[in-house]
């Protein structure tokens, strides 16, 4: 048996390669080459049977029927399970038109309170989550019957249902959604108790619960997909009686997903080599200070912008992560105040100088790295956007370096700041804004000046950046206090008594509340339909926010990488696929 893929090969550079067809045996994967990831040609009409269509598509069968029958309600549970599976395995992009059709019909049935959705707790929770994430107006009040654990009759075997309720509760986007708040409280407690008591006998399910509870909003696509491939288990959906339908496609879908992941890995490894060459060309390897974040920057960038077709966007994001970190470290520790000012002056002038005019090798290397990278990206963006965006890119650098300067001045002069004064510039200095607004120039979408200067764009930047900034502050305030620098935690701790000085525990609690408020507002904006910003762009803001949770929820992974080193190894090791595993549809050990 073999899997037949329709391949559209996307190169690493801007040069295009013609399409071709290949057949890969299901258990004999090709050696990774410089070609991009597999892309299956999507030319199927939305069908009543998503499970069947997935089977047909990954086996190269095409239904060109013009008939688009209505989806029978009985198909909805299995179709929702298939959507969730495709998303968790990272191959949903190949079936987007089919997924959109199923969700449109699901929303119609949701409005009618169709019993096949509402009669089953797992199906209702999953439908709510998938619809809300896609921007459909669904009320959390429909989950009110499950808000109180006392009203839910749970058996030991109901862990899967509780997981779905827990995941649904994480999609709270309004402050007043008390149903989701209550739901989150008891489901998280219940799942933790199940872990502690050892009542989850299924080892894969046990690991899945651990993973969700550890840092749900910090689950990056790349890491989450790799975990899901390891923990893939068809029996996860047995409560919806969908397992029998899934079992026939289980091994094909898993083989297809692993093949796709391996192809993405091959492209990521090639791009990492390109990034390394850029790093050396910029002479950043000659800087004798700061954090070595090249691989970490690329890893985070590939987890935020994972689509193999978006190589330029991913590399732009990674380059900016590296550049902003190098300059941030220079402002913080390595450079003098005058040298730091000099970098800002040079960016404002935007002219190359003779080497002796820079004042130091470090200033020369940093400015020329920014200068050459921005000029190169501006040329590429001109092709993508059909207009010159260089002035925007330079403006973003001036804004960032100005925020660095403000922070440097406040630390050096020991200026007393209020929390609002600190946050007014620190949301820019966390670098999310410049990284995102530069990289989205390469998503294949035309972005007008009106869009980029809109209040929506500013708010997306601010809410997402504040989440990352405050998460960072909570993990680094001890170190920064020793270095006599300030952040939101130390500012609140040092507040005068008449302003309501509070304990460290109370400060952390207050900042977590601000983080949650901004995260919910960001999710609300990203999910909202009909706005000036395309959803594809808004998703980058949300995924960057997840990157902040990933890096700063349990330490400072960017400065002292621990978990990220394990995940990098896990994500860059090629997946293997064993015949026995395929035949069994996965095991539970």
Swiss-Prot record:
GO biological process: gibberellin biosynthetic process
InterPro entries reported for this sequence: Isoprenoid_synthase_dom_sf, Terpene_synth_N, Terpene_synth_N_sf, Terpene_synthase-like, Terpene_synthase_metal-bd, Terpenoid_cyclase/PrenylTrfase
Note on cofactor: Binds 3 Mg(2+) ions per subunit.
Annotated catalysed reactions: 9alpha-copalyl diphosphate + H2O = (13S)-vitexifolin A + diphosphate; peregrinol diphosphate = (13R)-9,13-epoxylabd-14-ene + diphosphate; peregrinol diphosphate + H2O = viteagnusin D + diphosphate
Tagged with keyword Manganese: no
Entries under Gene3D superfamilies matching the protein: Farnesyl Diphosphate Synthase, Terpene synthase, N-terminal domain
Localization in the cell: Plastid, Chloroplast
Enzyme category, top tier: lyase
Motif DDXXD motif: chain residues: 328-332
Tissue and organ expression note: Mostly expressed in trichomes of leaves and fruits.
Pathway recorded for this protein: Secondary metabolite biosynthesis; terpenoid biosynthesis
GO cellular component labels: chloroplast
Family classification: Belongs to the terpene synthase family.
UniProt domain comment: The Asp-Asp-Xaa-Xaa-Asp/Glu (DDXXD/E) motif is important for the catalytic activity, presumably through binding to Mg(2+).
Name of the protein in its database record: Class I diterpene synthase 2, chloroplastic
């Amino acid at each position: 048996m073999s899997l037949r893929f329709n391949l559209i090969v996307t190169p690493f550079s801007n040069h295009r390669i013609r399409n071709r067809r290949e057949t890969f045996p299901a258990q004999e994967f090709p050696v990774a080459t410089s070609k991009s990831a597999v892309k299956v040609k999507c030319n199927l009409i939305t069908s009543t049977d998503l499970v069947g269509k997935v089977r047909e598509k990954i086996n190269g069968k095409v239904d060109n029927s013009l008939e688009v029958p209505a989806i029978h309600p009985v198909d909805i549970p299995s179709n929702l399970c298939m959507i969730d599976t495709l998303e968790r395995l990272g191959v949903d992009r190949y079936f987007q038109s089919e997924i959109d059709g199923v969700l449109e019909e699901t929303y119609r049935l949701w409005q009618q309170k169709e019993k096949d959705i509402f009669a089953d707790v797992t199906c209702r929770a999953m439908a709510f989550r998938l619809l809300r994430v896609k921007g459909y107006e669904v009320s959390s009040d429909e989950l009110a019957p499950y808000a109180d654990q006392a009203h839910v009759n749970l058996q030991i075997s109901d862990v899967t249902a509780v997981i779905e309720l827990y995941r649904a509760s994480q999609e709270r986007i309004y402050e007043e959604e008390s149903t989701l708040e209550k739901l989150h409280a008891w489901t998280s407690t219940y799942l933790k108790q199940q872990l502690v008591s050892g009542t989850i006998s299924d080892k894969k399910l046990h690991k899945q619960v651990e993973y969700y509870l550890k840092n749900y909003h910090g689950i990056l696509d790349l890491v989450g997909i790799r975990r899901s491939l390891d923990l893939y288990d068809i029996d996860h959906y047995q409560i919806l009686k969908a397992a029998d339908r899934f079992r026939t496609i289980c091994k094909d879908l898993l083989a297809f997903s692993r093949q796709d992941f391996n192809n993405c890995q091959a492209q990521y490894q090639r791009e990492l080599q390109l990034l390394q060459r850029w790093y050396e060309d910029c002479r950043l390897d000659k800087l004798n200070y700061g954090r070595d974040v090249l691989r970490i920057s690329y890893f985070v960038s590939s987890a935020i912008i994972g689509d193999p077709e978006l190589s330029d966007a991913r590399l732009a994001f990674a380059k900016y992560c590296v550049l902003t970190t190098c300059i941030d470290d220079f402002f913080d520790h390595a450079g003098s105040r005058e040298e730091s000012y000099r970098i800002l002056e040079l960016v404002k002038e935007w002219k190359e100088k003779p080497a002796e005019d820079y004042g130091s090798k470090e200033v020369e290397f940093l400015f020329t790295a920014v200068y050459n990278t921005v000029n190169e990206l501006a040329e590429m963006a001109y092709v993508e956007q059909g207009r010159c965006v260089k002035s925007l890119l330079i403006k973003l650098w001036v804004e960032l370096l100005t925020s660095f300067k403000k922070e440097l001045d406040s630390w050096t002069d020991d200026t007393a700041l209020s929390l609002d004064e600190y946050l007014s510039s620190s949301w820019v200095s966390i670098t999310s804004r410049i990284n995102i607004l530069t990289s989205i120039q390469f998503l294949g979408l035309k972005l007008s000046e009106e869009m980029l200067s809109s209040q929506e764009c500013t708010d997306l930047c601010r809410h997402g950046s504040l989440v990352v900034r405050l998460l960072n502050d909570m993990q680094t305030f001890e170190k920064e206090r020793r270095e006599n620098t300030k952040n939101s935690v130390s500012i609140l701790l040092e507040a005068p008594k008449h302003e309501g000085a509070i304990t460290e525990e109370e400060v952390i609690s207050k900042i977590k509340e601000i983080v949650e408020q901004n995260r919910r507002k960001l999710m609300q904006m990203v999910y909202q339909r009909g706005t000036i910003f395309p959803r594809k762009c808004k998703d980058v803001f949300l995924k960057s926010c997840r990157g902040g949770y990933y890096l700063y929820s349990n330490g400072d992974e960017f400065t002292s990488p621990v978990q990220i080193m394990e995940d990098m190894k896990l994500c860059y090791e090629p997946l293997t696929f064993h015949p026995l595993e395929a035949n069994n549809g996965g095991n539970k050990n």
